[in-house]
A protein has these predicted regions:
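Nucleotidyltransferase catalytic core that binds NTPs
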Residues: 1-162
Length: 162
């Protein structure tokens, strides 16, 4: 099975890791990583996002051990628009978080319009931080939690330029 998922992944956290693990359980994985131009447009909160090259490097570091563990292949492709690679016929499934289910449904509409079979949309629940809220990159960048969801009240967040 060929599995797709996409995002900005800045920084990678345990919520992303849950998505990656589920994807590798299903098959070979292709991750669409938002381009430098697209990344800020996908943010619900205006914040600095590291460069594509930095994010790709960190993402590959996360994916390599999972690929080895599940004996799967993976690739990272640049996304220049939100529906990205998932409209390509080679994919069978799309792994999404609860807030990106709508994007998955939109991708299936585009696939249907193009005469391509719909993807199985696999929803992975949020991972909850120790304070009971969802782990998110924005919360990490703001200094509220670390990548594992531990509360970090004494930590400063990332500033607007790093």
């Amino acid at each position: 099975m060929n599995v797709a998922l996409g995002g900005t992944f800045d920084p990678v956290h345990d919520g992303h890791r849950a998505l990656f693990e589920r994807a590798f359980e299903l098959g070979d994985v292709t991750v669409g990583l938002t381009s430098d131009e697209l990344a800020p447009k996908t943010r619900h909160v205006d914040r600095y996002v590291r460069s594509f090259a930095e994010r790709k490097r960190d993402l590959e570091t996360e994916l390599e051990p999972l690929a080895a563990e599940y004996d799967r292949e993976f690739a990272v492709h640049e996304l220049t628009e939100p529906t990205g690679i998932a409209t390509e016929p080679r994919f069978d499934a799309l792994v999404v978080s609860p807030e990106t289910v709508d994007t998955g449904e939109r991708i299936n509409e585009l696939r249907e319009d193009a005469g391509v079979d719909p993807l199985d949309i696999v929803v992975v629940d949020h991972v909850i931080a120790e304070d009971g809220d969802v782990i998110s990159s924005t919360r990490i960048v703001n200094g509220e939690i670390d990548e594992h969801g531990n509360v970090t009240p004494d930590r400063d967040g990332r500033d607007a330029t790093r």
